[in-house]
């Protein structure tokens, strides 16, 4: 017997693993994909799950159904006799449209509500409650889907057990401070209503003689009666008066008198009286709201003070973002404008007037068109920003690949990028903050979203002023940036014109999103003529994971070669500009005005010491001694130029190449 046959050979399983390595990789990839899908589903069904758990605690059966999988033609009529209470959680997306999962349900419901073949009693006997999710920053269609679903169901005869709830993502105007708090408050009332239904207790129905259901029977108390007789009484009231039992929110859109007109013929000469009556009631309602302080306290807490910009819900979201994995490039020395490892990234304003599809904060930050929050002083913001920057740098002590001299340099802030999140120019004391930076010998890089032209005109000199040009046409800008201003396109154009009169360095920042804004070259060229920027920075969009707030995917990230081709074609349309620099790692190219090409050499970099001298002279002269971008330019090193083999990687540094070079679906 051969003794070697009984000896376990380690090489055999290793060889087997190597041969089947692709199947192992595939298994890991599938497992990770399934895990990500599960996480997304859990996040999307968060509110529904919370509500289901609360209902289950009452010993009531409950089921969560995705509206995408729900056929209203077959199942809604079944709810008439089922005695179930149907709760609809619906969100309002761009332009007041429903989300993709609720699109068919809403379309069917709208058509059925106006189809005479269904009638006003088609769903009589069905019981429901609606909670809408929206953002009041978009006032023209705030919670439009929730309101419509509530209205359409009511028009088909559905019986409300609870008034419509409205969740508001805008932490400033949200009644309870966040959409989660809005939902919790509504859920508490809904659970109380279910408990009352269990006991056979119902709120006393209105007799139809009050204005919009504001009588005592809607505000106070309830009376005990048999559930069967209660429902008969309510159905009787509905048939005779066409009013809504229980609480209702659709009286805002359809009052008792308005609804009565649906069942009666109105003479043409009476329409004027009816419209006058409706307008009068609307004015009375607005006056009543003003007296109660709804308008006066917008953006304020219960004590009448301005709300803090960072709410508990927002702080939790910010913490998740800060804990994200840090990239190797954090301490890289060179980028388009020289050193970056000494650059502190911060913002005095988390708020923004846009909800861009590629925003890496996934719309957790507040939005608004004006400042509505408590304001921290510039001195405090700068002090804490420097401390937090230093604490972040300290985390890299001893990390492989981090050079000791750069670690020490990084502890001293030399530059400040006001671009972390939000719209820095919204901060009321932005000019004071900039002066503090310059007094500390810190250069300033400010990025604005081109929606505040007046603030751009009034801005003090900065080292470099960026304007985000995410699209070149009105339609594409609305699609990509999703701005809050109704006149967003005019604001955008005026902002670019305001940039043209600035004497310091100005930059257009173009973010390319494949299939969305890469085919508008002629329009981009026209926008360049408006602002006459010193530089145009063109960058491929960066993918920042899946988000329910955006449809952006990896497929929208352009390859670097595609960005280069776009830039070449754009330069052909703007003869005063040329391609100057390239940073392949950032998927970014720099187009510069020819005035920065002196003697055949590019001077696109910044002489920071000279800038500090110039800004000091400007301050000492009270603003009379001005200076221009050419006064503090520096020569661009050869390895940062477009076409150089280094592609902006400093030859003194060590370049780390990715070992796995498998084909990806995008340029990310």
Swiss-Prot record:
Superkingdom of the source species: Eukaryota
Region of interest (Disordered), residue spans: 202-269
Gene Ontology terms: biological process: wybutosine biosynthetic process
Biased composition (Basic and acidic residues): 213-223, 233-243
InterPro entries, sorted: Aldolase_TIM, Flavdoxin-like, Flavodoxin/NO_synth, Flavoprotein-like_sf, rSAM, tRNA_wybutosine-synth, tRNA_wybutosine-synthase
Its EC number(s): 4.1.3.44
Metabolic or biological pathway, per its Swiss-Prot or TrEMBL entry: tRNA modification; wybutosine-tRNA(Phe) biosynthesis
Residue numbers binding FMN: 43-47, 130-162
Ranges of residues in domain Radical SAM core: 336-580
GO-annotated molecular function: 4 iron, 4 sulfur cluster binding; FMN binding; metal ion binding; tRNA-4-demethylwyosine synthase activity
Cofactors that this protein relies on: [4Fe-4S] cluster
Residue ranges of every copy of the Flavodoxin-like domain listed in the record: 37-191
Assigned protein family: Belongs to the TYW1 family.
Role according to the record: Probable component of the wybutosine biosynthesis pathway. Wybutosine is a hyper modified guanosine with a tricyclic base found at the 3'-position adjacent to the anticodon of eukaryotic phenylalanine tRNA. Catalyzes the condensation of N-methylguanine with 2 carbon atoms from pyruvate to form the tricyclic 4-demethylwyosine, an intermediate in wybutosine biosynthesis.
UniProt-recorded name of the protein: S-adenosyl-L-methionine-dependent tRNA 4-demethylwyosine synthase TYW1B
Organism: Homo sapiens (Human)
């Amino acid at each position: 017997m051969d003794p070697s046959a009984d000896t376990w050979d380690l090489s055999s399983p290793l060889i087997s693993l190597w041969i089947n390595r692709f199947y192992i990789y595939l298994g890991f990839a599938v497992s990770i994909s399934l895990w990500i899908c599960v996480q997304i589903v859990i996040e999307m069904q968060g509110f529904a799950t919370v509500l289901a758990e609360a209902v289950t605690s009452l010993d009531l059966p409950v089921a969560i159904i995705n509206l995408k999988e729900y056929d209203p033609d077959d199942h809604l009529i079944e709810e008439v006799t089922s005695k179930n209470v149907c709760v609809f959680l619906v969100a309002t997306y761009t332009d007041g449209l429903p989300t993709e999962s609720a699109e068919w349900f809403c379309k069917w419901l709208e058509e059925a509500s106006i189809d005479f073949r269904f009638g006003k009693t088609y769903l009589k006997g069905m019981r429901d409650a609606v909670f809408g999710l929206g953002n009041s920053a978009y006032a023209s269609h705030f919670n439009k889907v929730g309101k419509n679903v509530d209205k359409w169901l009511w028009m088909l005869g559905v019986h409300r057990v609870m008034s419509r709830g409205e969740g508001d993502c805008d932490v400033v105007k949200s009644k309870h401070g966040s959409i989660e708090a809005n939902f919790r408050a509504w859920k508490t009332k809904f659970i109380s209503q279910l408990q009352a239904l269990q006991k056979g207790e119902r709120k006393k129905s209105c007799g139809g003689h009050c204005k919009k259901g504001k009588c005592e029977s809607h505000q106070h108390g309830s009376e005990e009666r048999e559930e069967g007789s209660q429902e008969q009484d309510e159905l009787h009231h509905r048939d005779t008066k066409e009013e809504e039992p229980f609480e209702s929110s659709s009286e805002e859109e359809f009052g008792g008198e308005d609804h009565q007109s649906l069942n009666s013929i109105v003479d043409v000469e009476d329409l004027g009286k009816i419209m006058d009556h409706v307008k009068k009631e609307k004015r009375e309602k607005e006056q009543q709201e003003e007296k109660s302080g709804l308008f006066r306290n917008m953006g304020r807490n219960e004590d009448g003070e301005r709300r803090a910009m960072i709410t508990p819900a927002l702080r939790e979201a910010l913490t998740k973002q800060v804990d994200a994995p840090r990239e190797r490039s954090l301490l890289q020395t060179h980028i388009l404008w020289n050193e970056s490892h000494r650059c502190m990234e911060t913002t005095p304003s988390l708020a923004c007037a846009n909800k861009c599809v590629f925003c890496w904060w996934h719309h957790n930050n507040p939005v608004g068109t004006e400042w509505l929050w408590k304001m921290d002083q510039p001195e405090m913001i700068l002090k804490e920003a420097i401390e937090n920057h230093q604490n972040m740098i300290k985390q890299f002590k001893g990390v492989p690949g981090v050079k000791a001299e750069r670690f020490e340099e990084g502890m001293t802030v030399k530059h400040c990028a006001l671009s972390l999140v939000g719209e820095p120019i919204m901060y009321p004391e932005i000019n004071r903050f900039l002066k503090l930076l310059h007094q500390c010998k810190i250069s300033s890089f400010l990025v604005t979203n081109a929606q505040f032209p007046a603030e751009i005109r009034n801005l003090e000199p900065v080292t470099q002023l960026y304007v985000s040009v995410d699209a070149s046409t009105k339609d594409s800008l609305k699609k990509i940036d999703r701005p809050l201003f109704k006149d967003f396109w005019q604001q955008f154009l005026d902002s670019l014109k305001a940039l043209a009169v600035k004497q310091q360095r100005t930059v257009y920042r173009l973010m390319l999103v494949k299939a969305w804004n890469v085919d508008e070259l002629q329009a981009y060229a026209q926008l360049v003529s408006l602002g006459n920027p010193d530089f145009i920075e063109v960058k491929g969009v960066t993918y920042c994971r899946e988000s329910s707030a955006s449809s952006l995917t990896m497929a929208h990230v352009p390859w670097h070669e595609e960005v280069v081709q776009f830039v070449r074609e754009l330069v052909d349309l703007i003869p005063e500009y040329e391609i100057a620099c390239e940073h392949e790692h950032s998927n970014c190219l720099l187009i510069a005005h020819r005035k920065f090409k002196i003697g055949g050499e590019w001077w696109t970099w910044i002489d920071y010491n000279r800038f500090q001298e110039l800004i000091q002279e400007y301050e000492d002269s009270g603003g009379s001694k001005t200076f221009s971008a050419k006064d503090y330019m520096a020569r661009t090193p050869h390895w940062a130029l477009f076409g150089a083999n280094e592609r902006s990687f400093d030859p003194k540094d060590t370049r780390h190449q990715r070992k796995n070079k498998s084909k990806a679906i995008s340029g990310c």
